[in-house]
């Protein structure tokens, strides 16, 4: 299967995107197509052996829309084309100004005669009715020309059997203009045949002002909507702007500045104080304080030195270093983040599919309601003038856009808000599902704990602490075990001189033996001491105490004499307890799963306050724990970082990977926490709840608006209350509904997580 991003032009509302999706998804060989109305693009997955891009594009063009394969930029991540968007905004602004000028003229002339506003005498009085009508028509024609897109797209879609919002506007405005023309011919007939008694009926039904002002108001709404929608992708634009345009490279002993696109893997790059890191890499010389706030949300600079990884787009606030480029273009962390965010905003949440389905039937239903309403009023004895007013009002007040925009705008803004806080959401489905989570499973190592053992206790017997630590490190420095590495690191941190060990031997599951200064020495657990016939009876209380604290005690022997004990532990992250408390305060049950023994698991459970600890769990058992909870009816989020967490992450309703984890875990997850901070789990779920609340608000008001507005426009309340909606007010209301939905979604940018 091949995935392709297509740019699509000519879409005006959700009926358009729904139509494209429906038709393309029916094509043989197409597995899935998801159209993003906000970004005018579509992600399509298809079988190349059956269908290709050309066939898909041709099918879209047959529907009356433009389509082309998206041209990826230097970052090789699918991103909004800002230049195209800016150009479209500029063109729309010109259309808006022209529409308002000429629509304003026809509106002033029409309403001025009714309300006594100052007007030239040659259009006043019964004898000048025809001149007045012709002048209004003259002002109206430029508006029709300026906003001809509504007619071109609307009529084309209407004739193809896929009417959209443009179709409603085209029919409403076009019917008004045609009725105005009919009135002009009627007035000409009245003057030509001296039937001045017919003039008032025609003069009161010109409708040129309705035709022009409807188009102008819709254009105002579209412009405001486009401006608001441009802010929905601010997070992606901000990420795109992080990438520097150039890099300072050192090749063959010479330094020079080159475009970042020319950097290749293995290049040595120089990053001075205040400069941005061009691509991903590792420091090979020097050090710096890296500002990673734009990617992780972490406000304080992070100190980096030789061997540390650096991320392209971060800023070196102080220091000077050389780095080796390890990832460029689409392989950089920043490009992957942009791609993840873009793909998430292009995916559809299940709740969006309901709105899309409704939108697909909405426009034909509205046209039917307009025709039926007009026919009913004619049958009740109303005039053609009244019936036409009803039909036009119904057409222009209905707004499929409000329904279509309700979900994608909230998803896009919410996903961007998450990215700004270091929470990458890979799909809209995950964002929707997360708000229903009632159970959170946390892996222990690397998630609750730091994942890197450290020395916690040094308990010497007959020697000093430093002597014991140096002796232990000398024994362990050839070991590849994480516990041994922790002891060596502690000794090196104190700059202790380590003795040289000989005849080194590793005993699996017990420890190591070696010769130091001619003496037989050993380091290991209680089992090793028992094998060496060292008396352990006095050590049991100490062992139990350390184990109950989640620590692993290691004992050190020289020439059969016990020198002391060093305890090593994978320490709990500073924010883990607070994060678990916040999840519980949000009404969630929190479990910890680990492959560690029961004593260690219980010690960590007591320390951080999880509701339950499941110990000695194999990788496949973690997935089974998730499945069991799901079978009990729980919505489960799994948080982990390792390869052994991948099956459980994939099985969970929402898989959340710690950003410092393995690529496999990140690939299997639905969300990625860049900062590797458990507090962000609560933030992600809180964000999901806020987004879903926003979507429901948008859908509620969009449905209410149409449910109330359409009957009002159809004249349902006219007989009882005398309420009749003017087409101009209907057009204004329609524009406001779309703008209000987008504006409400933009509030998500400022929520506190």
Task: Give the location of each predicted region.
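Conserved cytosolic catalytic headpiece of P-type ATPases
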Residues: 1, 36-38, 302-309, 315, ...
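Signature of the cytosolic headpiece of P-type E1-E2 ATPases
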Residues: 103, 200, 483, 492-603, ...
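Conserved cytosolic catalytic loops of P-type ATPases
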Residues: 28-50, 205-208, 237-331, 429-472, ...
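Actuator/coupling domain of P-type ATPases
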Residues: 55, 61-70, 75-80, 134, ...
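Flexible metal-binding regulatory segments at protein termini and peripheral loops
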Residues: 1-133, 156, 229, 254-255, ...
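Membrane-embedded alpha-helical bundles of multi-pass transporters
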Residues: 115-131, 159, 178, 417, ...
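Hydrophobic alpha-helical transmembrane segments
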Residues: 138-150, 160, 174, 210-239, ...
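Conserved ATP-binding TGD loop and adjacent catalytic N/P-domain core of P-type ATPases
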Residues: 1-2, 18, 516-518, 552, ...
């Amino acid at each position: 299967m091949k995935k392709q991003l297509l740019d699509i032009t000519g879409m005006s509302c959700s009926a358009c995107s729904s139509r494209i999706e429906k038709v393309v998804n029916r094509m043989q060989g197409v597995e899935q197509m998801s159209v993003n109305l906000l970004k005018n693009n579509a992600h399509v997955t298809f079988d190349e052996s059956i269908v290709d891009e050309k066939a898909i594009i041709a099918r879209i063009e047959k529907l009356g829309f433009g389509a082309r394969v998206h041209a990826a930029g230097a970052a090789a991540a699918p991103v909004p084309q800002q230049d195209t968007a800016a150009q479209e905004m500029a063109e729309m602004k010109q259309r808006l100004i022209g529409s308002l000028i000429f629509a304003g003229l026809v509106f002033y002339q029409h309403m001025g005669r009714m309300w006594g506003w100052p007007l030239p005498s040659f259009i006043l009085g019964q004898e000048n009715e025809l001149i007045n009508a012709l002048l209004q028509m003259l002002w109206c024609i430029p508006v029709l020309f300026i906003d001809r897109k509504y007619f071109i797209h609307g009529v084309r879609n209407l004739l193809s059997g896929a009417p959209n919002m443009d179709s409603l506007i085209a029919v409403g405005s076009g019917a008004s203009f045609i009725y105005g023309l009919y009135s002009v011919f009627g007035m000409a007939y009245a003057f030509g045949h001296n039937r001045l008694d017919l003039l008032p009926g025609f003069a009161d039904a010109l409708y040129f002002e309705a035709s022009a002002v409807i188009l102008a108001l819709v254009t105002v709404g579209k412009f405001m909507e486009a401006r608001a929608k441009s802010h929905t992708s601010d997070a992606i634009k901000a990420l795109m702007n992080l990438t520097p345009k150039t890099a300072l490279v050192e090749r063959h002993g010479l330094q020079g500045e080159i475009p970042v696109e020319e950097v290749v893997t293995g290049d040595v790059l120089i990053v001075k104080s205040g400069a941005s890191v061009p691509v991903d890499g590792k420091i090979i010389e020097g050090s710096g304080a890296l500002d990673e706030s734009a990617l992780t949300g972490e406000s304080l600079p992070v100190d980096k030195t030789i061997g540390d990884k650096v991320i392209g787009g971060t800023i070196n606030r102080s220091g000077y270093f050389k780095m080796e480029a390890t990832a460029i273009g689409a392989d950089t962390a920043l490009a992957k983040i942009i791609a993840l965010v873009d793909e998430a905003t292009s995916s559809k949440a299940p709740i969006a599919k309901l709105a899309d389905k409704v939108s697909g039937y909405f426009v034909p239903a509205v046209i039917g309601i307009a025709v039926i309403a007009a026919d009913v009023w004619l049958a009740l004895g109303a005039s053609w003038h009244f019936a036409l007013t009803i039909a036009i009002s119904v057409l222009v007040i209905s707004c499929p856009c409000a329904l279509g925009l309700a979900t994608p705008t909230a998803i896009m803004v919410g996903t961007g808000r998450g990215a700004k806080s270091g929470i990458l959401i890979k799909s809209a489905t995950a964002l929707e599902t997360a708000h229903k989570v009632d159970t959170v499973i946390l892996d222990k190592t690397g998630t609750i704990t730091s994942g890197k053992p450290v020395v916690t206790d040094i308990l010497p017997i007959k020697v000093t602490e430093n002597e014991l630590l140096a002796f232990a490190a000398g024994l362990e420095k050839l070991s590849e075990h994480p516990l041994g590495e922790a002891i060596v690191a502690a000794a090196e941190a104190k700059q202790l001189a380590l003795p040289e060990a000989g005849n080194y031997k590793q005993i699996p599951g017990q420890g190591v033996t070696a010769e130091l200064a001619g003496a037989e020495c050993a380091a290991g657990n209680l089992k090793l001491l028992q094998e060496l016939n060292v008396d352990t009876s006095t050590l049991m209380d100490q062992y139990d105490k350390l184990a109950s604290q989640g620590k692993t005690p290691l004992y050190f022997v020289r020439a059969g004499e016990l020198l002391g004990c060093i305890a090593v532990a994978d320490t709990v992250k500073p924010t883990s307890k607070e994060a678990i408390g916040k999840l519980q305060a949000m009404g969630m049950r929190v479990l910890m799963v680990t492959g560690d023994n029961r004593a260690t698991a219980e010690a960590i459970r007591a320390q951080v306050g999880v509701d339950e600890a499941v110990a000695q769990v194999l990788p496949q058992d973690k997935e089974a724990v998730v499945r069991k909870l799901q079978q009990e009816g729980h919505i489960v989020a799994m948080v982990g970082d390792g390869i052994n967490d991948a099956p459980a992450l994939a099985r969970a309703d929402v898989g959340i990977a710690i950003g410092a984890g393995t690529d496999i875990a990140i690939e299997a997850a639905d969300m990625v926490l860049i900062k590797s901070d458990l507090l962000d789990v609560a933030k992600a779920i809180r964000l999901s709840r806020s987004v879903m609340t926003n979507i429901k608000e948008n859908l509620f008001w969009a449905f209410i608006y149409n449910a109330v507005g359409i009957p009002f426009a159809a004249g349902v309340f006219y007989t009882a209350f005398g309420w009749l909606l003017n087409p101009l007010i209907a057009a204004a209301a329609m524009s406001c509904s779309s703008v209000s939905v987008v504006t409400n979604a933009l509030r998500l940018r400022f929520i506190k997580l």
